[in-house]
């Protein structure tokens, strides 16, 4: 019992005799169903040990886990950085400035005080309305806020609300914010009545005049000035006396000058701003400017005028309402910046009258543009009716510095005229013209430009004999003027348009006549017209000064024409050769006719003008910091900005310039006409003057004397990187040159018809050589025989195609603009 208890492997239920069986076999026998075990042949196999499991945190796994961790960390950091950048740097604010008129609310004087309860309440109401308009629009997720800056009276009644709208959105989506789109949302929200046929509609309960809604893109700097707390140079000036002149003066000699003057007059009157002098840094309004607005906020479409350079000439501007904004900007005052001006309250004027004309072949009265002598405001309108006393008389209108021509499909830049149901365009010029209407009853309507204020117009009127416009013995010019018949074909441009010198029969001059020797236009002109050469003798002998003589610095005059900078000292004081360092030498050795490659260094005054990095126009060096080019290269808001322009000097192959300078300033002639290409000339001032060390590679070309005469058939050269053929898609990489000859002006006028005295033609009538697209603004260089210097005779302007037979190129005649050039570049005198 004890033994059983001591052995736990034994159990009492298993110990039964019946469960035991014994089988006895003999030794040599085999157990049934068993194979004898195999004896091992070799060494006994070692017993297999159980495999140990490797620990998880071994070196290899640690490296893998660490790599995965670093990858996750890098992805997370990059994602966070991307989110941060997208929230900070990639979002831009877009500012819009505008105004509209509320017709059903009367103006309160308290609205002038921005801290008053009345102003704050009205501003809150308008802001809530604007917020509702844009938060329910397609731009809702980008809309940030609206700010009412001013609430003013106006001459049409009600309130004029000036406001800002701000959007914030990713930079990549900024292109969807078109000015027209944002304005359309506001205008479309105004519900107008078709039945009442009125422009006044409901804008969330506000009665808004749809015609008054103006909305333009604005500048962040203007927004900050309008709504910011720092208004150190901002003034609100209210004028309520008709006889007073309110002074407007401010100046600074250093620091910055950023001033806003808000001018408001009593209801029913206008504001006239008169500027006596202004000091600015002339740079095309890039930094310094004085801008006059027909509003109380800087709304681009409400600009009346912009001044970009200093002036001491009295200028005055008139508003179209009882308010005006004047902004003076000069962020980096170097010497002096400021304005001296005054403003006054004036009544509105009606520009209409009926006039009875009595005189024949004389001018008996004057009409003028509105508010003369002020610049007349945009969108003004004048009507005049003229009636003559006789049916045989017509009406003659004499314009000063102005001309009207038939309206073309391009429209009119300076307003349009309707005269007896015929449409005309007006343009400014530097001489007078006469326009005749062959009718005893004349209805005239002037519709002013819708963009900016324009220069004042003064027009004389009178009657004339329809059957004989000019008196007997007179020649009728294309400009409408009448000149004595004796002045026809005398070599002098008496008509101002050269029409008296066209279609002249060339006759051999009467060299022996006293009148020819004393007053002949061919005398002392540098060309030998008489066989014995007497027309070119005694040309520097002192004579009394006239309009046809050359005047020295010591007031001595002589008959020699084109004496300035001709390489010969003619004046006793040497003043005729002062400042004549142009075209001192030339490496011109070989000429290739027909638009072939030039030689490097041949044309050291040639310039390539690049716009946004690409070659666009040509120009000529006339001094160390001034270039001369064509006005049409810079026509339009985008091209007139000097910022994207660079000048490449001393260049033979495109991309290999010896000197490159940004353009600081572009001066386009004030009379440039984009429809006719008249006055197609512009000056460019470099930001950096080219160094004297490059004078062997860069040289100025000589400016011709004022009124220089040229002879047809004279050989000259046109150069540039323009297209070699009209069908080419791009310009030449190598500077091209082509020999051309000056074409007779009569042939030029016969070919094109619209040639003015400020143009000349040059080319080869076969069409073999000509300028083409890309050459515009480049030089037409002619070599003077007397001293071998190169003269800038013309500037590539326009033409009919390129190299077409019988259609020569048209060039700006530089000699017609010498006084204008000297106005900006006096060092050339």
From Swiss-Prot:
Active site: residue positions: 632 (charge relay system), 680 (charge relay system), 776 (charge relay system)
SMART domains for this protein: CUB (SM00042), LDLa (SM00192), Tryp_SPc (SM00020)
Regions of this protein lying in the Extracellular compartment: 84-829
Biased composition (Basic residues): 32-52
Residue ranges annotated for the LDL-receptor class A domain, each copy included: 469-505, 503-540, 544-581
Glycosylation sites: 401, 465
Biological process annotations from GO: proteolysis
UniProt xrefs under CDD domains: CUB, LDLa, Tryp_SPc
Transmembrane portions of the chain: 63-83
Bilayer topology term: Single-pass type II membrane protein
Entry's localization field: Cell membrane
Tissue expression summary: Expressed in brain, eye, testis, skin, epididymis and salivary gland with lower levels in heart, skeletal muscle, thymus, ovary, prostate and uterus.
Keyword set includes Repeat: yes
Residue span(s) of domain Peptidase S1: 592-826
Entries under InterPro entries matching the protein: CUB_dom, LDL_receptor-like_sf, LDLR_class-A_CS, LDrepeatLR_classA_rpt, Peptidase_S1_PA, Peptidase_S1_PA_chymotrypsin, Peptidase_S1A, SEA_dom
Domain SEA: 92-220
Disulfide bonds: 233-259, 285-308, 351-382, 470-482, 477-495, 489-504, 511-530, 524-539, 545-557, 552-571, 565-580, 617-633, 716-782, 748-761, 772-802
Keyword set, alphabetical order: Cell membrane, Disulfide bond, Glycoprotein, Hydrolase, Membrane, Protease, Repeat, Serine protease, Signal-anchor, Transmembrane, Transmembrane helix, Zymogen
Domain CUB: 233-346, 351-467
All ranges on the Cytoplasmic side of the membrane: 1-62
Subunit structure, as described in the record: Forms a heterodimer with SERPINA5.
Function description: Serine protease which preferentially hydrolyzes peptides with Arg at the P1 position.
PANTHER family associated with the record: ACROSIN-RELATED, TRANSMEMBRANE SERINE PROTEASE 7
Protein name in UniProt: Transmembrane protease serine 7
Phylogenetic classification of the source organism: Eukaryota, Metazoa, Chordata, Craniata, Vertebrata
Name of the gene encoding the protein in the UniProt record: Tmprss7
